[in-house]
Curated annotation (Swiss-Prot):
EC nos: 4.1.1.37
UniProt keyword Cytoplasm, yes or no: yes
Source species: Wolbachia sp. subsp. Brugia malayi (strain TRS)
Site (Transition state stabilizer): 86
Family: Belongs to the uroporphyrinogen decarboxylase family.
Pfam families named among the record's database cross-references: URO-D (PF01208)
Binding site for substrate: 36-40, 86, 160, 212, 326
Localization annotation: Cytoplasm
Name of the protein in its database record: Uroporphyrinogen decarboxylase
Domain of life: Bacteria
Keyword Cytoplasm included in the entry's annotation: yes
GO cellular component, one term: cytosol
Task of the protein: Catalyzes the decarboxylation of four acetate groups of uroporphyrinogen-III to yield coproporphyrinogen-III.
Enzyme's top EC category: lyase
Length: 347
């Protein structure tokens, strides 16, 4: 009965982002939300987190997550809220000691094989504060606003787990024995499926998979480490929730975006700012999201407005969601974000 009620909720959703993806056509208006729309660019965010001791503490504080998630929707009238969290929650569930160091970013005690990872018996127990936040946000959001849940792509999470932090060379993970890498990715994939299913059950009406490190791979490695696990996640979710909108984001995948769209089964794809929009329009035959350069938005308002108009003109007749090609930079002036949202909503 629970699954039937979830299916009914998803099917009847009036949220504009999920509707654009599911119907595969552009509505009356182009929807807009921004990756990292909740965060350090907002003064209300900085006030809300000033007394917290760590980023992970924020991620597991239900009421704070609700507040932070809703802030950009309230300020800018975004068409979607994305739950305030992090792609490394799955790594934390697997027993890795995830921490965030100012000026360095995420750090993790690195592992070399899947046996070092904890076997999570009940992912819901560890992530319940986040899941409860999803439920509370959904209750507070107007029905026309989407609530986006998310997770990191298994390859990206694996690269952090093995490297221990962000890397420019990815030497540890690329030199790991293929069978060990495969086992780690498989374990991450299974946990990711469980986590995303729970997010949907608690109220998310769209899911995004952030494969932020996809661009380091090519050929067979891209197929095995990005496409294969993504396809497994998509198949598992759509097996339980048919036609559920899933956005993939294989950042910096270049021409491999085409293979990703054709082989994974994702419902829509978010393109990074290096993807030529004319190429995307010609080659990617599913709903598109993107792809303004966040640096333009942060440092050159007039050029950002000009580029936004060009993107809209290119994708106007397609099922399209306006977004950035990566996350909002912390020093982005809020007046620039407001001008961007106003422009998109006026089209």
């Amino acid at each position: 009965m629970k699954e039937e009620s979830e299916l009914a909720r998803i099917k009847s959703s009036k949220a504009v982002v999920s509707k654009t993806i599911k119907e595969g056509k552009q509505g009356r208006k182009i929807p807009i939300w921004l990756m990292r729309q909740a965060g350090r660019s907002l003064p209300e965010y900085r006030r809300a987190v000033k007394d917290t001791s760590s980023f992970m503490e924020i991620c597991y504080n239900t009421d704070l997550v609700v507040e932070l998630t809703l802030q950009p929707v309230a300020r800018f009238s975004m068409d979607a809220a994305i739950i305030f969290s992090d792609i490394l929650i799955v790594a934390d569930v697997l027993g890795c000691d995830v921490d965030f160091i100012r000026g360095v970013g995420p750090t993790i005690k690195p592992v070399k094989n899947f046996k070092e990872l904890r076997n999570p018996q009940k992912i819901e127990t560890k992530t319940l504060p986040i899941l409860n936040a999803i439920r509370k946000v959904r209750d507070k959001l107007p029905e026309e606003k989407s609530l986006i849940g998310f997770a990191g792509g298994p390859w990206t999470v694996a690269s952090y787990i093995i490297e221990g932090r962000s890397s420019k060379t990815f030497s540890k993970v690329l030199n790991l024995h293929p069978s060990s890498l495969e086992q780690i990715i498989e374990q991450i994939t299974e946990v990711t499926i469980s986590y995303l299913v729970k997010q949907i059950e608690f109220g998310a009406d769209v899911i995004q998979l952030f494969d932020s490190n996809a661009g380091v791979l090519s050929g067979e490695l891209f197929e095995e480490c990005v496409i294969k696990p993504t396809k497994k996640i998509v198949s598992a979710i759509k097996g339980k929730f048919p036609d559920f909108p899933i956005i993939g984001f294989p950042k910096s995948a270049g021409s491999l975006y085409k293979d990703y769209c054709e082989k994974t089964g994702v419902s829509a794809v978010s393109i990074d700012y290096n993807v030529p929009i004319e190429w995307a329009k010609e080659n990617l035959k599913i709903p598109l999201q993107g792809n303004l350069n966040p640096s333009l938005l942060a440092y050159n308002k007039m050029e950002a407005i000009k580029e936004t108009k060009r993107i809209i003109d290119c994708f106007r007749d397609l099922p399209f969601i306006f977004n950035l090609g990566h996350g909002v930079l912390p020093n982005t002036p809020i007046e620039n974000i407001a001008a961007l949202v106003d422009l998109v909503k006026s089209q």
